[in-house]
């Protein structure tokens, strides 16, 4: 199976996420990563969906997705043609004897220290899924107490955009 990243532009309405995820579920696809958020247009949301699947069955799902009235556009983003990032928060055991190692590891991976107490250090890291997996592998021997990781968010490289808009405007979140 191959890892596929789909960027799906949808109407920002209730129930759309349920309908999209139901299509994947009916075809027995496991969604490895899912991130949904607003776009530069307050009427639209972007879903970034990562699945491990063969190309032919995935093509069937994307055809069915295109039939949903709330789906505006679907683009498959391949690794080199897209910028992909995830967010990781990880709480690591860090007694005084190991604290320097934890802090040096954070610096090496450009992670930020967001909380420190007598027994643990909490780090925030952003990067590619591979980078975050490497960070976790280095921290594992020290003892990971807990972690939370976001889904992948991705944009295609270059000047083109899914919405076709030449200039993006920020969403007003004060309303």
Indicate residue ranges for each PLM-predicted region.
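Long, contiguous binding/interaction regions
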Residues: 1-46, 50-175
């Amino acid at each position: 199976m191959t890892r596929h990243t789909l960027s799906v532009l949808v109407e920002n309405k209730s129930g759309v996420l349920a309908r999209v995820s139901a299509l994947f579920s009916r075809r027995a696809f496991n969604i490895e990563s899912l991130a949904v958020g607003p776009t530069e247009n307050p009427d639209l949301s972007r879903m970034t969906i990562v699945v491990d699947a063969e190309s032919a069955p995935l093509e069937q799902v994307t055809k069915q997705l295109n039939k949903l009235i709330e789906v505006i556009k679907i683009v498959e983003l391949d690794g080199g043609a897209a910028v992909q990032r995830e967010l990781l928060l990880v709480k690591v055991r860090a007694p005084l004897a190991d604290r320097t190692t934890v802090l040096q590891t954070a610096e090496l991976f450009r992670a930020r220290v967001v909380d420190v107490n007598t027994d643990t250090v909490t780090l925030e890291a952003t990067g590619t899924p591979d980078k975050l997996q490497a960070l976790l592998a280095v921290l594992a021997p020290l003892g990971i107490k807990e972690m939370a990781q976001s889904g992948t968010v991705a944009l295609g490289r270059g000047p083109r955009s899914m919405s076709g808009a030449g200039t993006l405007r920020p969403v007003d979140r004060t309303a």
